Amino acid sequence: MLINVISIFPKMFDIIKDYGITKRAIQKHLVKINVLNPRKFTKNKYKNIDDRPYGGGPGMIMTAEPLFLAINQAKSLSSNPVKVFYLSPQGKKLDQSKIMELSHQKHIILLCGRYEGIDERLLISKIIDEEISIGDYVLSGGELPAMVLIDSICRVTPGVLKNSKAIQEDSFYNGLLDYPHYTRPKCFNCIKIPNILLSGNHSEIKRWRLKQSLTKTWLKRPDLLNKLILTKEQESILHECQSKMDKPKI
């Protein structure tokens, strides 16, 4: 998969190339990350990529032409169909289903905004295909959201993780939050791990984990349950949990 990033701070992306899951994905030649600086596509001697907004107001706006030229250059780096995604607080909120969708693409372009944003004509003229947000808050630019997106995509790319089951047990993969995890020692701070995890009974452990996952989702993110069609087993386990607690059923 080719991920082309358009950013005025290309060195920020050196970090994700050198560590963790993204480094492994690159080393295995499963993902390639390329960063283009729109300053290289400006036609003024000062390499400015921003200007004052028409109509007045605070801050500066990223100009359309260098971004447009950078996008075209990024598109030319692959013969595969490509979509351009603008990291923006006005976009649709990123979730696991979107990550899975993007992970199947062969080429994507991520546009990182700065200042007060980009010239609206890039959106009006459909040069940008979609806006993506990582939450209802504002950052200084689109670089960190782009890194979040890249890390998530690399994690679900087949062949990156040694154990593919780890992905299937992540929070949100099946619409639920993850179950609790424990490791050595057996007792820490006077708290022992649940006996079921020492039993060796894999079917009971699997049921316990499903119960914990359902309970945690119900208590912390009940909105997620409203989006799911639960199996009969899941409904039975959830009702069992709800009957033992005071929290209203959903």
Swiss-Prot record:
This is tRNA (guanine-N(1)-)-methyltransferase. It comes from Buchnera aphidicola subsp. Baizongia pistaciae (strain Bp). Homodimer. It is an enzyme of class 2 (transferase). The keyword S-adenosyl-L-methionine applies. GO terms for cellular component: cytosol. It catalyses: guanosine(37) in tRNA + S-adenosyl-L-methionine = N(1)-methylguanosine(37) in tRNA + S-adenosyl-L-homocysteine + H(+). One of its GO terms (biological process) is tRNA N1-guanine methylation. Disulfide bonds: none annotated. Belongs to the RNA methyltransferase TrmD family. One of its GO terms (molecular function) is tRNA (guanine(37)-N1)-methyltransferase activity. Specifically methylates guanosine-37 in various tRNAs.
